Amino acid sequence: MISSIKPVLPSLTAIVGIGIYFAIWWALNGVFNNYNKKVLNAFPYLWLTLTLSLACGSLMMLVSWVALAHTIGHVEAIVSMSKVVVSFTHTSSKAVRQPLASLSQASSWARCALAAVMELNFNMIGFMGAMISNLAFVFRNIFSKKGMKGKSVSVMNYYACLSMMSLLIVTPFANSVEGPQMWADGWQNDVSKSDQTLSSKWVVAHSVFYHLYNQVSYIPRCLNHHLPNPLKHVNALGAAIAILGTFIYSQIKNRVKKNHILLVLCLGMLEPLVITL
């Protein structure tokens, strides 16, 4: 006997509410990325930067697999953005996990091409940082969804715990790799060239918006962790071709530095190929 049970469709209010959450999430993520790059350009001490951003939570737990995955993902994302432009990091680190999702990626191909054009020098550290960040955040999302099943803390408190656990993990590394003395010297030598007050505001804004955009991303807990990401992803084949084009261009540029005309011709031949992706 065939069951006559019909699936329950979400109401218009629920759909609009989820859409608002996603819009806020993406907006906060964009603001965070901009401030993050400003801070790294003015004060290139990535370990202090990521430590400060993780300090925007509440300390409630000590050790957790999800916190470790979150820490690795955040560290590698900051490492990648310190080496390459923001668009290249996000193009590389956001690969589509569902083949059928590529049908909705037409608007993302342009992003892929833009990232390749903007990042003219291929940087393996930046690329690998984005790849490791992507993998770590996948595990973080899976562990997080499992941790939210059954009787659990609220999503707001859950992410507060996650942030501070990551802070405990990353602080010893920040002190050993850079340390307070290096931060103080760097602040005097690097930031003194610009407005220190403005740079301080950038650091605060970067830390706050990092916490806000991640906190909002945890609110729609009813959804699978793949669903909020289609607009942030790019087709895997398109990303691979764009990254390959960036690498080829950087090699050509290094070989023809003394011949400006040949460099322009090579760029003209490469750019249409990348844009057509």
From Swiss-Prot:
It comes from the Eukaryota. Its main location: membrane. The chain crosses the membrane at residues 8-28, 46-66, 124-143, 153-173, 230-250. One of its GO terms (cellular component) is membrane. Signal peptide: none annotated. It holds the Pfam family TPT. It is found in: Membrane. The keyword Transport applies. It is a multi-pass membrane protein. Keywords: Membrane, Sugar transport, Transmembrane, Transmembrane helix, Transport. Belongs to the TPT transporter family. GPT (TC 2.A.7.9) subfamily. This is Putative glucose-6-phosphate/phosphate-translocator-like protein 1. It comes from Arabidopsis thaliana (Mouse-ear cress). The lineage of its organism: Eukaryota, Viridiplantae, Streptophyta, Embryophyta, Tracheophyta.
